[in-house]
Amino acid sequence: ASQIEEKISTLLENHIRYDNKLIMVFNHLTDDDIHEFINAFIKVYSDSTSFEGTEYTADSCHQVTEDLILYNFKIVREVSERKELTMSDLGNLAEDVLGQYSRIIGYRPVKITCFDALAIDIKNKRLILQLDLGSIVLANAVDKFFQNLRVSINKAFRKLGVTNCRVPEKAQFLNLYTTLQNFYDNEEGEVTKASFSTSKNNHHETLRDRARDIRKAEYHLRGKAAEEALGGKIRPYRISKRFERITNTWPQVYTGVHYRYFNKAISGAKSLYEAHIFDIKSYDDYIFIIDKILVNRTVT
């Protein structure tokens, strides 16, 4: 029984640390940078007032392995909860309303405690910024939440007199835009969901029937052949892909942009800095899926 409890505890701990996160990756830390960040966070976690004036508190620090240090920051975030309303929800209005509509959907604000984080990957010299519960963060709030986390950490550094390190600006993090096409083109792994553009219109596909990879499904292959016959190609602007790390362990990554941005004729390189990682059950899954994201970048 104690072994089972220990396994459950480990799974829960790993879920809180690594799973369902929106991440940004800064890949250019030096040994000096790492040393300075570690010393700065020692000051932050030694002073209970370090995050005063922000929405965050310094929650916990974990030396997960000799290669990874995880700094957690607690914040209470308001999200919208979707609910199908019942007769009891509608009260006296139920009979009239439900007589006109088969389903009534409502949204209400819910406060959720989140544990955002900054991770220092010592071995790979990376700084990883991550938002908790990535699946419930609305797309139009992602930039705002990452900016709030970055600014709050840097404000804590300044408050404590730390002058030699700062969390970088967003534009200094790795641009993941080219992973969109590469996740589709590279054979490794399985594509589980995709939104893509063709010469005629946009399509949104998910796994159905017994398909494990959209790209190998008959319904997708027919459309792909028709597009290629016209001289075009499948161009994804949102994509989810899973990779088998070990037998029956499939960490996943989702990344994408809004179609209007994808299709907009703008000069210069386009940018995408965030990826959503999920089905992460361990530290090894976490490092593995980040490596898969980075290896699928085309550096231009």
Where are these regions (language model features)?
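Intrinsically disordered, low-complexity, charge-rich terminal extensions
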Residues: 1-300
